[in-house]
């Protein structure tokens, strides 16, 4: 888990360049390159434009390699998955080819790896040797400035004695192994490859791997030989409803992302509603919601620093345990407040969009957009804070103008979701894990 200081390095708030308005008074109560042909091949994703890879707080060596590859903006899959995957969360992701699934597990494992000579930390399984080489090339591309990290590929059809050579010298043996299931199981069974130090277990094109009885058996045998506490990530372009439960048997409370096409991205388990109201009624409504809803922790998003400060002050006057975080704070104070919220000292955080990118608090299960986000992209960043580690969350968006209504329409169209009006009563079980 990253430290609070690491979580908050180098955030900039271009989004806050809006005209400040005082809060109302409150009343109490690709695949990146899934081609892998040339390590210097340029590419670009049509992703969320306000976010760059630097917002994920990756190692400088990784950012440099990403820049060399010509990638500027992460794809939607990457910007939803990477903030969680680099924290060790299990991931089950379905998205068509070209959306950057490979880069999710390559970057997240390289971010977390601490190479030790003679120890394999990462296992990546795939169903063909061609795909294995593509993945190895991706590791080579992104680890070019991490000279101590070594990757090797293994597959059937060649004498296993050749594979033994790769593990003889600990100073040269791989930390990351990409392999087909049959050969990997043979290496483990013959005690050529020791898997007692594995921390990351990845299946690429997992449906192909798990639908085959033979490959599934090999995978299960290798899986059982690895430590019980490890990160498991599975990716595929196609993931039927029948295969998903099988995938999840290998996982613990995974982040589930299913992208059926370039526009549709569903955060499963997230209830999404709007409230139509006048600007002057927002504070009364936020007060009512905080009184009536059950929550672990809440993030309330506003559009400017001054509104964050004012709303935070008003909430505290009403005895709500609030704290505010925005880019106008000195770095040291920002880290201190972030840590207080992360450590559960405070249950309510009023924030600007600085909190909507790559920041993850396990207990947050409700997000309230006090001010409408300025774009569908910003909406996705914000509501993604809720229920990230679990399967349930609640997002409530205030709409107080015609412009707000238009943005809400764009959000629903972009992500093909139906955001309904907040009902008078909402079932706690729909947004709180039991």
Curated annotation (Swiss-Prot):
GO biological process, one term: mRNA splicing, via spliceosome
Reaction equation(s) it catalyzes: ATP + H2O = ADP + phosphate + H(+)
Primary subcellular site in the record, as a coarse category: nucleus
InterPro entries, per database record: DEAD/DEAH_box_helicase_dom, Helicase_ATP-bd, Helicase_C-like, P-loop_NTPase, RNA_helicase_DEAD_Q_motif
Annotated region (Disordered), positions in chain: 1-43
Molecular function terms, GO-annotated: ATP binding; ATP hydrolysis activity; mRNA binding; RNA helicase activity
Record keywords, A-Z: ATP-binding, Helicase, Hydrolase, mRNA transport, Nucleotide-binding, Nucleus, RNA-binding, Transport
Function according to Swiss-Prot or TrEMBL: ATP-binding RNA helicase involved in transcription elongation and required for the export of mRNA out of the nucleus. SUB2 also plays a role in pre-mRNA splicing and spliceosome assembly. May be involved in rDNA and telomeric silencing, and maintenance of genome integrity. Links the mRNA adapter mlo3 to rae1 for targeting mRNA-protein complex to the proteins of the nucleoporin complex (NPC).
Quaternary structure note: Interacts with mlo3 and rae1.
Family that this chain belongs to: Belongs to the DEAD box helicase family. DECD subfamily.
Full protein name: ATP-dependent RNA helicase uap56
Organism annotation: Schizosaccharomyces pombe (strain 972 / ATCC 24843) (Fission yeast)
């Amino acid at each position: 888990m990253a430290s609070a200081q690491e979580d908050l390095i180098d955030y900039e708030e271009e989004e806050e360049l809006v005209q400040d308005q005082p809060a109302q008074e409150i009343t109490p109560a690709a695949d990146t390159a899934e081609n892998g042909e040339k390590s210097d091949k340029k590419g670009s994703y049509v992703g969320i434009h306000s976010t760059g890879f630097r917002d994920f707080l990756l190692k400088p060596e990784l950012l440099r390699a990403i820049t060399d590859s010509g990638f500027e903006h992460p794809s939607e899959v990457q910007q939803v998955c990477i903030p969680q995957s680099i924290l060790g969360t299990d991931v089950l992701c379905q998205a068509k080819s070209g959306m950057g699934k490979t880069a999710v597990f390559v970057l997240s494992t390289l971010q977390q790896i601490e190479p030790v000579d003679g120890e394999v930390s990462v296992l990546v399984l795939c169903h063909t040797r061609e795909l294995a080489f593509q993945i190895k090339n991706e590791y080579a591309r992104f680890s070019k400035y991490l000279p101590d990290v070594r990757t090797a590929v293994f597959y059937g059809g060649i004498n296993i004695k050749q594979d033994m050579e790769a593990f003889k010298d600990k100073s040269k043996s791989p930390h990351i192994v990409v392999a087909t299931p049959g050969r990997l199981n043979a290496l483990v069974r013959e005690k050529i490859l020791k898997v007692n130090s594995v921390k990351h277990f990845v299946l690429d094109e997992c449906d192909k791997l798990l639908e085959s009885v033979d490959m599934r058996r090999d995978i299960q045998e290798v899986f059982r030989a690895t430590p019980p506490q490890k990160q498991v990530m599975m990716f595929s372009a196609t993931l039927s409803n029948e295969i998903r439960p099988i995938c999840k048997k290998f996982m613990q409370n995974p982040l589930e992302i299913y992208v059926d096409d370039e526009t549709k991205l569903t955060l499963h388990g997230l209830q999404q509603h709007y409230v139509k109201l006048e600007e002057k009624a927002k504070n009364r409504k936020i007060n009512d919601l905080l009184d009536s809803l059950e929550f672990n922790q809440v993030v309330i998003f506003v559009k400017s620093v001054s509104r964050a400060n004012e709303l935070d002050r008003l909430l505290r006057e009403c005895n709500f345990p609030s704290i505010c975080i925005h880019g106008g704070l000195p770095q040291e104070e920002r880290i201190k407040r972030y840590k207080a919220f992360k450590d559960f000292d405070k249950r309510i955080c009023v924030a600007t969009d600085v909190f909507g990118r790559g920041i993850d608090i396990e207990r947050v299960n409700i997000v309230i957009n006090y001010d409408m986000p300025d774009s569908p992209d910003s909406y996705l960043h914000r509501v993604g804070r809720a229920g990230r580690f679990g399967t349930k969350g609640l997002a409530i968006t205030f709409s107080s103008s015609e412009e707000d209504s238009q943005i809400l329409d764009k959000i629903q169209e972009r992500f093909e979701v139906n955001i309904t009006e907040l009902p008078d009563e909402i079932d706690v079980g729909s947004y709180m894990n039991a």
